[in-house]
Amino acid sequence: MGRPPKCRRVEFIPQCTYFKPAGIPLWNLEEVGLAVEEVEALRLKDLEGLEQEDCAERMGISRPTFQRILTGARSKVAQALVTGRAIRVEGGNFEYVARRLRCTGCRAEWEPDPSDLNEQQCPKCGGKELMTRPERCSRPKRGAGKYRVPKKR
């Protein structure tokens, strides 16, 4: 028996979850299901143009796993476009992680609007040189609380 799939990190939840070809009535329409993490893989690789290693790191998975997710997503989208099927985005094994940006000029931090995929700029100074704030580890540091400072005699 295989192990359960690892939970994937997702920074964007799509607001439009159903795409239908024009001219085909709903009762006569077949669907292709696309998981939320598959949409995230398409967004990171094809829309943001990141390298696979960076995409995999942001999703918290290995490169081969990212490649499998991306290949499956592209195959499903191509199948829907070629055969005239609807695309339904739902489900998957993921956790939503809000991404924070930091301006390199004024060091302001904010959470970008997930529906706005255009080029971001700092709301405080208008700067365009931004970086993603590094994730902070929620675990205590190694050895924290184990050592005591010896008392002076």
Curated annotation (Swiss-Prot):
Q: Which domain of life is it from?
A: Bacteria
Q: Where is the composition biased (Basic residues)?
A: 139-153
Coiled-coil-forming residues are none
Q: Which InterPro entries match?
A: RNA_pol_sigma_r3/r4-like, UPF0251, WH-like_DNA-bd_sf
From the UniProt entry, list the residue stretches annotated as the region Disordered.
Answer: 129-153
Q: Which cysteines are joined by disulfide bonds?
A: none
Q: Where is the composition biased (Basic and acidic residues)?
A: 129-138
Q: Describe the family membership recorded for this protein in Swiss-Prot or TrEMBL.
A: Belongs to the UPF0251 family.
The cross-references to PANTHER family, in alphabetical order and at most eight, read:
PTHR37478, UPF0251 PROTEIN TK0562
| Name of this chain's protein | UPF0251 protein Daud_0090
Species per Swiss-Prot/TrEMBL record: Desulforudis audaxviator (strain MP104C)
